[in-house]
Amino acid sequence: MNNNLQRDAIAAAIDVLNEERVIAYPTEAVFGVGCDPDSETAVMRLLELKQRPVDKGLILIAANYEQLKPYIDDTMLTDVQRETIFSRWPGPVTFVFPAPATTPRWLTGRFDSLAVRVTDHPLVVALCQAYGKPLVSTSANLSGLPPCRTVDEVRAQFGAAFPVVPGETGGRLNPSEIRDALTGELFRQG
């Protein structure tokens, strides 16, 4: 996608996000749907769209670690744990961090932790940088259907008018690996 088209697509996506609505965008493996993590209205719309219970918790995807810091508590990390995490970021590995009490329950669900990732997908990096914060990110698929890997698949599942940032996925076959930031325990194989 040329720079002007990408810039226009990102600007249009930010307009939708500012309206507390949900967008779709390519990630490392599949298309994701996401919204403003600070908007309970937007997150509830996303959960309703996905038919996902709020108690499961969500993932935030960001352009850089600084964008994630308001949502996580990294004070318990040792230098070795921090080095391990930073050696995997940016990239397709999601880490579950302790969450401070200020992190909204619509993000953490029933947990006192939050799953977060610093992406290396150039379009998502540009989107998060332009928006100035991370996005809620979950796979773009309706309950019971496979995750979307193309714009056409997103539109087939969510409708022709659904706001999609066009682009290619990163080509990975599987969604991101998920690990505990403190213990390194593998929750989901990537």
Curated annotation (Swiss-Prot):
Signal peptide: none annotated. Keywords: ATP-binding, Cytoplasm, Nucleotide-binding, Nucleotidyltransferase, Ribosome biogenesis, RNA-binding, rRNA processing, Transferase, tRNA processing, tRNA-binding. It catalyses: L-threonine + hydrogencarbonate + ATP = L-threonylcarbamoyladenylate + diphosphate + H2O. Disruption phenotype: The knockdown of this gene results in a loss of t(6)A37 modification in tRNAs. InterPro entries: DHBP_synth_RibB-like_a/b_dom (IPR017945), Sua5-like_dom (IPR006070), TC-AMP_synthase (IPR023535), TC-AMP_synthase_SUA5 (IPR050156). Its EC number is 2.7.7.87. It is an enzyme of class 2 (transferase). This is Threonylcarbamoyl-AMP synthase. It comes from Escherichia coli (strain K12).
